[in-house]
Curated annotation (Swiss-Prot):
This is Phosphoglycerate mutase-like protein 1. GO terms for cellular component: cytosol; plastid. The active site is at residues 23, 135. It comes from Arabidopsis thaliana (Mouse-ear cress). May play a role in carbohydrates metabolism. PANTHER family: BROAD-SPECIFICITY PHOSPHATASE YOR283W-RELATED, PHOSPHOGLYCERATE MUTASE-LIKE PROTEIN 1. SMART domains: PGAM. The record marks 206 as: Transition state stabilizer. Belongs to the phosphoglycerate mutase family. InterPro entries: His_Pase_superF_clade-1 (IPR013078), His_PPase_superfam (IPR029033), PGM_Phosphatase (IPR050275). The lineage of its organism: Eukaryota, Viridiplantae, Streptophyta, Embryophyta, Tracheophyta.
Length: 282
């Protein structure tokens, strides 16, 4: 039987499922979609979500729960900007927060002018931040982050330990990251995922980061699959994908494979057996 073009096999323990999410609508998106120059405005420094954006968060959260994804996702990785953090905790965080001295909330009430109640860190995957999945760096104030201590106050249970500097040393007012640099950063981020033990990971990031990273990785895909992978993400869109460890960066062990031959016994395959006349017997 002939196999279809492009069909292949890969060990499960060398694969991860990633759930890619673009942040919900930010205040910069509203004017920026009408006039690109609006992205240059300092009024949109580290832009937060609009009220429509929060409704988009609510809709995606409902889907994540109704589809059962909330039970599968082991880790949430967020770009350390206001709009991605708000999206990450709003979609994947716990239910309404009850003030408890020994449990910090993922988000305090009204963080980033949200007019939202605090969000619980209970019964949800951990949320961590990583700078390498930030938006296109430089020039646009909406893509500049604030100090980490500011975020830690607003998002107490989010883990910021992977961020190396208190202030934003990556964003430059007069230098825009090239597309090639952005795509290379995206590939580096995906390689970094193989240092993580988690197999099902949600990543809350940005349109430019997703578009240029995914377009740099789709060369071997069928044209129809390329369209599925590489098209621009809508606000609060989620796409589920599998990444494969071809470079042997990940674990060499599988938790689901079973070695067999327990108890031990004769198990020579039938097509390897030969009779006295050296004729293969099958």
């Amino acid at each position: 039987m002939e196999t279809g073009a492009g069909i292949g096999l890969y060990p499960l323990h060398r694969c991860k499922t990633i759930y890619l999410v673009r942040h919900a609508q930010g205040i910069h998106n509203v004017d920026g979609e009408k006039n690109y120059k609006a992205y240059m405005s300092h009024d949109y420094f580290d832009a937060e979500l609009t009220q429509l954006g929060w409704k988009q968060v609510d809709s995606l959260r409902k889907h994540v729960h109704s589809s059962g994804l909330h039970k599968k996702i082991e880790l949430v990785i967020s770009s350390p900007l206001m709009r991605t953090l708000q999206t990450a905790v709003g979609v994947f965080g716990g239910e309404g927060y009850t003030d408890m001295s020994d449990v910090l909330p993922l988000m305090v009430a009204n963080a980033g002018n949200s007019s939202r109640a605090a969000i619980s860190s209970l019964n949800c995957p951990p949320v961590i931040t990583e700078e390498s999945c930030r938006e296109h760096l430089g020039v646009h104030p909406c893509d500049q982050r604030r100090s980490i201590s500011d975020y830690q106050f607003l998002f107490p249970a989010v883990d910021f330990s992977l961020i190396e500097s208190e202030e934003d040393k990556l964003w430059k007012a007069d230098v825009r990251e090239t597309i090639e640099e952005l795509a290379a950063r995206g590939k580096k981020f995906l390689n970094w995922l193989w240092t993580r033990k988690e197999k099902e990971i949600a990543i809350v990031t940005h349109s430019g980061f997703l578009f240029h990273t995914l377009n740099a990785l789709q060369n071997e895909c069928h044209p129809d699959v390329k369209k599925e992978i590489c098209g621009h993400f809508a606000n609060c869109e989620l796409r589920s994908m599998v990444i494969v460890d071809r470079s042997m960066l990940g674990s060499d062990s599988s938790v689901t494979d079973y070695p067999g031959k327990i108890p031990k016994g004769i198990d020579l395959p039938s097509d390897a057996v030969v009779d006295d006349n050296n004729i293969k017997v099958e």
